[in-house]
Design a protein with these regions (language model features):
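C-terminal active-site subregion of NodB/CE4 polysaccharide deacetylases
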Residues: 2-113, 120, 151-160, 168, ...
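Short, catalytically relevant binding-site loops at active-site mouths
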Residues: 145, 250-252
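Short secondary-structure transition/capping segments
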Residues: 133-146, 181-195, 292-300, 321-337
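Acidic/aromatic-lined carbohydrate-recognition and catalytic surfaces
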Residues: 106-177
Length: 351
């Protein structure tokens, strides 16, 4: 961590353990502190800003220390959830959406989501969420649930993690070969490869990843049965209040697909979850989820498939005027709880 990062952590810890965090929180909610420290409400601030819904996005919670696809350490996740339970109004995604629709978003509104369907969501995150009675929605890429297959990006992560070759040549738009002799150099090459893959259509993506796995001299197929959730685990969590949404079948970038294939991915993932849980699925999250990964046609296909909303990975919060098919989410990068708390309050204030 550089000097800037250390200074940020020191400053946020000081704020977190002082009265100043309350100032940030009250200002974000449309309050101003009077001289004696009491809160004075300014309704015009609320009217101008509205009340924001924040949605957090997680993928993995574990203590593996995998630098190629890092998860949130279990202890850090527990502290984050304890903070949310004590200081925020954590709603189920379904309730949060209804409150947005009714323009009745409460103060400090928060929803918690996970993408993809990793097994550590059940083994590590679920016990913490259950203990704290916090609602959560998990978006499933159904093609890898209970199949032993890996998501395409996990194939890339695994290939770079396991390869022992000293360098890689052949990355399009890259003139030089890439050193792979250190973790840092592998991560640099992995980042460039992912950016290239994101630009490809579905068939080209599959062919190129197959080429990459062969080039890096790692097994072409790896069993992911211990990595992804099973339907039995999903049903157990569902019976205990966890909500599940769709995240397509194969985790493609929808804007790169033909209309027919995009509709297939949306309909089939929804149908698979509804069949397994015998319950309607109304929520969806775009794979990758950047602005360029969906478009107006995509949003229309999502709506016509019967979903009530779609979540992006575009950073930010959501007001009661937000487009339900373009909801923003925040990624909780900060492992330091003071920085985590400060950043959430700052986002609420700055939105």
């Amino acid at each position: 961590m550089g000097l800037k990062g250390r200074l940020f952590r020191a400053a946020t810890r000081m704020l977190f353990h002082s009265h100043a965090m309350n100032v940030v929180n009250r200002c974000a909610n449309g309050y101003e502190l009077s001289a004696d420290g009491s809160a004075v409400v300014f309704p015009y601030v609320r009217k101008r800003r509205g009340r924001n819904l924040q949605i957090l996005i997680y993928h993995r919670v574990n203590d593996e220390g995998d630098q190629f696809f890092p998860g949130i350490p279990t202890g850090v996740f527990a502290r984050q959830m304890e903070y949310l339970a004590s200081d925020w109004n954590v709603l189920s995604l379904e309730e949060a959406l209804e409150r947005v629709k009714q323009k009745d978003v409460p103060d400090n509104a928060m929803a918690i989501t996970f993408d993809d369907g990793y097994r550590d969501n059940f083994l590590q995150a679920f016990p913490i969420l259950k203990k704290l009675s916090l609602p959560v929605t998990i978006f499933l890429a159904t093609g890898v649930i209970g199949t032993g297959r890996m998501l395409w990006h996990d194939r890339v992560f695994s290939a770079f993690r396991e390869t022992r070759i000293p360098f890689l040549e052949g990355i399009p738009n890259e003139s030089d070969h890439h050193d792979l002799q250190t973790i840092e150099s592998k991560l640099t090459a992995q980042g460039k490869v992912l950016r290239f893959i994101w630009s490809l259509g579905e068939d080209d993506r599959t062919r190129w990843i197959d080429w990459l796995v062969t080039k890096l001299q790692v097994p072409g197929h790896q069993d992911a049965s211990k990595t992804m959730l099973t339907w039995d685990e999903i049903r157990l969590m569902h019976r205990q209040g966890v909500s599940f949404g769709a995240h397509t079948v194969t985790h493609p970038i929808l804007s790169k697909l033909s209309s027919h294939r995009a509709v297939e991915e949306l309909q089939q993932s929804k149908a698979a979850i509804e069949h397994e849980l015998q319950a309607p699925v109304r929520t969806f999250a775009y794979p990758i989820g950047r602005r360029e990964d969906y478009n107006e046609d995509t949003k229309r296909f999502v709506r016509e498939a019967g979903y009530a909303c779609a979540l992006t990975t575009v950073p930010g919060t959501n007001t009661d005027t937000a487009n339900p098919f373009e909801l923003r989410r925040a990624t909780p990068w900060d492992e330091d709880i003071a920085a985590f708390a400060f950043r959430l309050n700052l986002m609420k204030w700055s939105s």
